[in-house]
Amino acid sequence: MRRIALIGVVVFVAACKQPAPPGLLQEYQSRSLMTCCNIHYETDQVNDANYFVGSTIPAGTPVKVDAMTGNSVTFTTAEGKKLTVVHSYGRDQESMQQWVSKLLVADDPKAKLATFSKSAQQAVREGRVEKGMTREQVIMSLGYPPTHRTASTTSNEWTYWYNRWVTYKVQFDDQGLVANVIGSPAPTQNQPIQPDPKPVPTPKSASHGKKRK
């Protein structure tokens, strides 16, 4: 058993040291990219579980790709924060390129964020998940769930990691809205998403419609 575990560690380390596919680094360095979603970090290296701990790089943060390996990408934000994100858990379900293409995107998520209701916008900015959120809003807030436990985002149940020991689940209803958040702790305040209030009609002027003499 120890030998099998050791082999697994050796394979993982070897994958980290392998270069990215030819041309992939140059492709990402030539593009204007930003983070798809909120990314949490405690150190300068995190993984695709995106634990809900530490500081946050907000969704839509512009980044410059510095380096890539067979299962990691290193980037720097405009503010100078350098972070390496390792594709640790989902590498058997999706390729390095598929994963990076989800993590770093060309279309600014902030433009889409601005179309959400005010309560949904606040939840995303605070990295929360609340009942009534759409799949898109949950991804922007929490990131993509690791694919080794959530094979597809069309599933009605997603598994996330609060930290390296604790998981929680996000369940969706048939309309694609969050119905339940199961597990504790979890990044929720139990405040269901509310639609924005309808604007109050402007009263018509008393002189409106009168003919001029």
Name each model-derived stretch:
Residues 12-15:
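C-terminal motif of bacterial Sec signal peptides marking the signal peptidase cleavage site
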Residues 2-8:
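Sec-dependent signal peptide recognition
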Residues 17-213:
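Residues within mature, well-folded domains
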